[in-house]
């Protein structure tokens, strides 16, 4: 019965042709989840830096500036592509930067209270987005296929690729607003939240890479994906959004102790 309800809802949303993406809706969900887990001290600090803007409202800043040539140096921060038989700790960081070094830079810049407010705000907005990217598994995909971009698939008969399926197609066709999606996530107790928040940035990178490897194993080149794929993997989408938000809150709370 659960599967039937899911498929009916999913097919109805697909028919209306919504254009919602992980890069928008997903990042806003992560911001919304994080906002609810901030300490009072962190809330006050963020209010001063962001002039009252919510995390959800600034979560897509890093994507919005991509078209501006002045910010091209930050393009490589959105992902890290790792050779299939390697872990991040086995490789040399790119000279252009990557998702991990980008997050580290953002944390350092926001943490230093001597930096100009303008700089701290810029890197704070980047940080909120990059923690979200870290939890989209294909942003920690394989070097050989550019994080799944070269792994061609079909999505409901239209051309796509594994990266796009996870970046856009599934959330696009599910059709919820970010507030609806955030509210639909499982309720967790304090112990469960604490468990999710454990670990370091590198631990979370390895976790996302492990999930990415499972996603690679779940498809074949040219495969036609549809309802059953979303039903199988939607729980992982929700889990990654929730983890991203809870861990973003942890990072921010530690920045403003």
Locate the predicted segments by residue.
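Sec-dependent N-terminal signal peptides
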Residues: 3-13
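N-terminal, motif-rich segments that launch catalysis or mediate targeting to/interaction with membranes
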Residues: 18-130, 137, 142-257
